Amino acid sequence: MATKTLKVTQTKSSIGRLPKHRATLTGLGLRRINHTVEVEDTPSVRGMINKVYYMVSVEELG
């Protein structure tokens, strides 16, 4: 069974943001603006994305 993945792209800078939000971006594997990573679609990852929703864009992959 194929697992669902999400394509997460950082769209805004982390400079001047809350330290916990910066740590969340690091936890997602994002380093800079326009950096894109593919992550597994799990509740914990969804929670991380919801925390920094204003700095990332998300696409669902099959």
From Swiss-Prot:
Cited CDD domains: Ribosomal_L30 (cd01658)
Pfam families per record: Ribosomal_L30
Oligomeric form and interacting partners: Part of the 50S ribosomal subunit.
GO molecular function, one term: structural constituent of ribosome
Gene label: rpmD
UniProt similarity note: Belongs to the universal ribosomal protein uL30 family.
Signal peptide range: none
Keyword entries, A-Z: Ribonucleoprotein, Ribosomal protein
GO cellular component labels: cytosolic large ribosomal subunit
SUPFAM superfamilies for this protein: Ribosomal protein L30p/L7e
Protein name per the record: Large ribosomal subunit protein uL30
Keyword check for Mitochondrion: no
Species annotation: Shewanella frigidimarina (strain NCIMB 400)
Keyword Repeat: no
BP terms from Gene Ontology: translation
Any coiled-coil regions, as ranges: none
